[in-house]
Amino acid sequence: MSRKTRILSAFVLIALAACGGGTGPYGSKSPPPPPPANTVAATAGLAFTPNPLTVNSGENVTFAFGAVAHNVTFDTPGAATPADIPGNNSNVSIQRTFTTSGTYRFHCTIHPGMAGSVVVR
């Protein structure tokens, strides 16, 4: 190997070593916190997950809306059915309390076919 090739190889190795491995002056980026228990996420893939979500009577359910706007309209309104979540909700989480046992089906009026349910024990 010529002297020129060795110098070039050493330079490349030093440059590569300088590019990786460190966290930089700002430290490492921590992972996002896990979603709270009893959360229904409205995904960018136009699905509610998990589906169904099973909870105990009296528990809160958090509907987490990401960057894509969604809403929640319950299919069977009634005294025990929580209030709908109207509008175009994005980057926000909204809670509803389920006080009576049963299956509560809901859908997004913005995205036809996007539906989910909460089963209350």
What is each residue range found by the language model?
Residues 1-18:
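Sec-dependent bacterial lipoprotein signal peptides
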